[in-house]
Amino acid sequence: MATIHRPRRGSLAFSPRKRAKSEVPRIRSWVADERAGMAGFAGYKAGMTHVIMIDDRPRSLTEGMEISVPVTVVEVPPMSVAALRVYEPYNGGIRPAGELWAENLSQDLERAITIPKARRGASLEDIESRVDELCEIRVLAHTNPRLLTGVPKKVPDIMEIPVTGRSVEEQLKAAEGLLGSQVAVSNIFNVGEWIDVSAVTKGKGTQGPVKRWGIMLQKRKHSRTGKLRHVGNLGPWHPARISWRVPQLGQTGYHQRTEFNKRIMAIGTNGTDITPDGGFVGYGVVRNEYMLIKGSVPGPVKRLVRMRRAIRPGAAFAPKAPQILYVSKESKQGV
C-alpha cells in the first residue's frame, strides 16, 4: 500500500478546546502608541449588514468602483473609568504598585464587584511622587449595558485597559483626566483605522470529531460497521495510552478568539441610520453609538467584543476613511 502524506486534520494550537473562563476576553499584548489615551474599547455585537462603498484598495481590479462589503454592527455606548492602577518593575516583570478609585462610581458597579474600602495608594500625590519608579499606567473601565436595549442585563463588564503615551508621566496625566469620566469610542479610534477584535465564539456544546476537528468520514467497507463519523485509529499499542493529539469528541465553540486587522468602516451616534427594518434579529434597535467593522466578528449577537489598535497592521495601504454610498437597512427577519 502506498504511503499517504497529508496534513493532520485540525489545529493543535488551540488545545485544550474547552470553554472560556470568562466572556470578557483577556488581552495580553497592546500597541505602544504615542497617542495619549486608552488603548482599547469594548462594545456589544448587534448583527451584520452590508454597505456599498468605493473600493480604495490600491492596485485592486475594482479600484475606484462601487463594491458591496459585509460589515458587523457593534453598539458601543460610552465606557466609564472607575479607577487607575499603576505598575512597577519586579523580578523581570511588573506588579501593581497602587490604585486610585474615582469618587462618582456607577451604582451598577456594585453588582459586579465589591468596591474596596481600604484603597492602597489612594492618594494622587503619592502616585505622582513615585512616577519615576513606575513603568505602566492602566485604568479599570467598565461597560454600561443598562443603556442598551438589546442586551438584557445590568451588571457591567469590567476590564483593565492600558493608557498609552510618550512617557509614563504623559500616561499618568492622561489617566488622571480619564478617571471618573465616560469615554466615547470616537475618542479612541478613527474611521478607517485597523483594529483587532477579541470575543468568545458561539458555543456548540459537545460535538463529534468530524465537526470538531474536520476529520474525514469512514469510506466504503469501513462504514459498514455502523461507525461512519469517528476516527479510524486511536494510536499504537504502546505507549498504552491515548495521545492528546488524537481527534476526539468534546466541547466545541465558546472559545476566546482574536481576529487581526479589521477595518473600521464607520463610527456614528444615530443608530437609526444602520438599524434594519424590524431591528436586528435577536438584538433589536441600536440606540447608542455604533461602529461598522468590515467582515465578521466572533460570537453571537449580544456578545461582548473587545477592540484594540492593530498590533501587526498590514502594509496594504495607510488607514483612511472609506467612502460609503449606501448602508443596507433591509429587514433581516427570516433571512
Curated annotation (Swiss-Prot):
GO terms for cellular component: cytosolic large ribosomal subunit. Keywords: Ribonucleoprotein, Ribosomal protein, RNA-binding, rRNA-binding. PROSITE patterns: RIBOSOMAL_L3. GO terms for molecular function: rRNA binding; structural constituent of ribosome. Residues 1-20 are annotated as: Disordered. The keyword Cytoplasm does not apply. One of its GO terms (biological process) is translation. Belongs to the universal ribosomal protein uL3 family. NCBIfam families: L3_arch (TIGR03626), PRK04231.1 (NF003261). Part of the 50S ribosomal subunit. Forms a cluster with proteins L14 and L24e. PANTHER family: 60S RIBOSOMAL PROTEIN L3-RELATED, LARGE RIBOSOMAL SUBUNIT PROTEIN UL3. One of the primary rRNA binding proteins, it binds directly near the 3'-end of the 23S rRNA, where it nucleates assembly of the 50S subunit. This is Large ribosomal subunit protein uL3. It comes from Methanothrix thermoacetophila (strain DSM 6194 / JCM 14653 / NBRC 101360 / PT). The lineage of its organism: Archaea, Methanobacteriati, Methanobacteriota, Stenosarchaea group, Methanomicrobia.
